[in-house]
Amino acid sequence: MQKPMGRMMMYRLLVTCILMSLPTVAGAYDFIADGIYYDLVDGHAVVTHNGQTNCYSGDVVIPETVTHEGTTYPVTAIGDYAFKGSTGLIHVTIPEGITTIGYSAFWDCMGLVAVTIPESVASIGEYAFACCYSLRELVYNAVNCEDFDWPSPFVYSGIASITIGDNVKRIPDFFACELESLTTVSMGKSVTSIGAAAFDECVGLTSVHIKDLAAWCTISYHDWTSNPLYYARRLFLNGEEIKDLVIPSSVTSISSFAFLSCSHLTTVTIPNTVTSIGDYAFEDCPSLVKATIGNGVTSMGTKIFNYCQNLDNVTCIAGRPPVFTESGLFYDLGYYADATLHVLSESVTAYQSATYWQDFSLINGDAIFYLLGDINGDSEINVADVNNVIDIIINGGSSGGHSRVPSPYCNGWAIIGDVNGDSEVNIADINVIINYILGSQ
């Protein structure tokens, strides 16, 4: 990874502010209704101004439709410069149906404190909310918005909190680029990709909040500047900071940069369902001390644990060493000398001769693979395991009871007999095994 690019030269801001402060070219509006000026364009109403700046104040509610001379028109756009310089504007309600927010539409609305972008918005112009210094909260719900160009619509604003709606799938290029006031990002559960430089130079970020850990694991980032966690360094799941990370079993791949710079992460457990781990997935996690990799992983990206200087315990229960796409777990060979690799006893020789894995100074064959459902440890799941669970329930454990064993589940441990992972051994676990047996035949 390269060093973060520097902030735009300050003279650009100065020149931009001078140019944008020049009077807007006066133009006629078609009509006014309830204090809002409109132009008519191809049968649609476009919110505009009266030819002067600072023509709106207080709370403005833009309607979904407006009637003029007996004809009702859908309101579909906020035009260029529409609210520019309206320093007395406090709140604006943008309705569903608005598809375009124009160039510098809210430039220098210094009293505006919050804004919600509706799902229908497909285009937001440069500088749309620039220099809105009192703007603190942005709720972004646009589900099909095109990528932004630099400078972004929100540049030089005072936004501190961004909430991404649950129906948003993509966050555009340059979305919050250089938004130094930003401290918190709350991510919607449907985001699948984040564009280039979306959170670049957001140096004030302190936390990222998510609702769905599985969804977070699979977000496609253009690069590291797309992930707000790079600057925030703290990730919260439903309000609780993630420190002992257990990847959900529904996850089959972990994206590149997924947990980059998650500074309070201490342990990572990757289940058997995961088959691939992307580049730099856990890079620069300085508190990470232990990582357990399940037996399903076959492909690993470059420098997954790079700069995890305290990681001294790596367990990989994959029988065949996963193949790296470019380089190993670390960039600095010194990390291999400080960490111990734990593998299955029968796999030691394979890891000792595998590219990059062989760089570990110490490879121990002491890893234990506990197959959930294989209660008696014979590497098969069958009727005998059902009987073992019954014995645990009735007799309290002559077949293992509530013993705990290492596993790529449940914070790195599993209770023998607890097949469904609810921390109890009961008839529900029997049903899981029976259903597995019936389904495997």
Positions of PLM-derived features:
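Structural signature of tandem-repeat unit edges
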Residues: 35, 40-44, 55-77, 87-100, ...
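Consensus positions within tandem repeat domains that build extended binding/scaffold surfaces
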Residues: 79-82, 102-107, 125-130, 151-154, ...
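Boundary at the C-terminal end of the N-terminal hydrophobic targeting segment
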Residues: 26-30
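Cellulosome-associated attachment modules in secreted, modular CAZymes
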Residues: 367-441
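A recurrent domain-boundary module in secreted/ectodomain proteins
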Residues: 179, 353-370
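Bacterial N-terminal signal peptides that target proteins for export
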Residues: 2-15
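Short, aromatic/basic amphipathic alpha-helical patches
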Residues: 151-153, 175, 220-226, 326-333, ...
